[in-house]
Amino acid sequence: MQYPLPIAHLIDAYMKLPGIGEKTATRLAFYTMDMPQEDVEDFSKALIQVKQDIHQCPICGNITEKEICDICSNPNRDQTTIMVVEQPKDLMALEEMGEYDGLYHVLHGVLSPMDGIGPEEVNIKSLITRLQKNDDVKEVILALNSTPEGESTSMYISKLIKPAGIKVTRLAAGLSVGSDIEYANSITLKRAVQGRTTL
C-alpha cells in the first residue's frame, strides 16, 4: 500500500535519523499525526531552532548557543589541562561525571582513512593552534573511544603535541567492574595492567 505523499515524506524524514528503520519511521509518522497540533508545532520549532541557534564554540568546538561556550568562558576552570573528545555528547557525559574541571577540545570525528576522513576533516589543526597560543596548558588528556580509529587519532595527536613539551595522557582503559579476566581481549588486559594504580 502506498501512503499519502505527506506521510511518505515524513517517514522518509524520520528514516534519516540514525537507527530508525522503515517500521519505526512509519510508527513515528503515525504517532506524529495523532499528536495535538500544538505539540507538533513545538516539535517542528525545536528542530528549526536547534539548527539556527546552535553552533560550534570557536575555541573548543563544543556546541553552544552563545558566542563562546560556558566551559571556555568560565575563568574558574583549570586552564592547565585540555581533554580531547570525539563528539560533544562525550563532553556532556564527562561533565555529568563531575570529576573533571579543566577545558575540552571537541574533534567532531576521528581519523578514518578508509572513509576518507583525514586530519583536515576533524578539529585537530585548531587544537594545535590553540596549544601554540596558550602557554598555560601543561597536559592534554586524550579521551577518545577505544576503536582502531580512536587509537590512530590519539597516536597522531600525541606525535604532534609531544615536541612542544606538553604532557600527553589518556584515560585509563581496562576491565569493567564485574567482568571476568578470561573473557577480556589481550588489548584490554594490557591496558588494565599498564594503567594499574597502587592501592
Curated annotation (Swiss-Prot):
SUPFAM superfamilies: Recombination protein RecR (SSF111304). The keyword Glycoprotein does not apply. Residues 80-176 form the Toprim domain. Pfam families: RecR_C (PF21175), RecR_HhH (PF21176), RecR_ZnF (PF02132), Toprim_4 (PF13662). Keywords: DNA damage, DNA recombination, DNA repair, Metal-binding, Zinc, Zinc-finger. A zinc finger (C4-type) spans 57-72. SMART domains: TOPRIM. It comes from the Bacteria. May play a role in DNA repair. It seems to be involved in an RecBC-independent recombinational process of DNA repair. It may act with RecF and RecO. This is Recombination protein RecR.
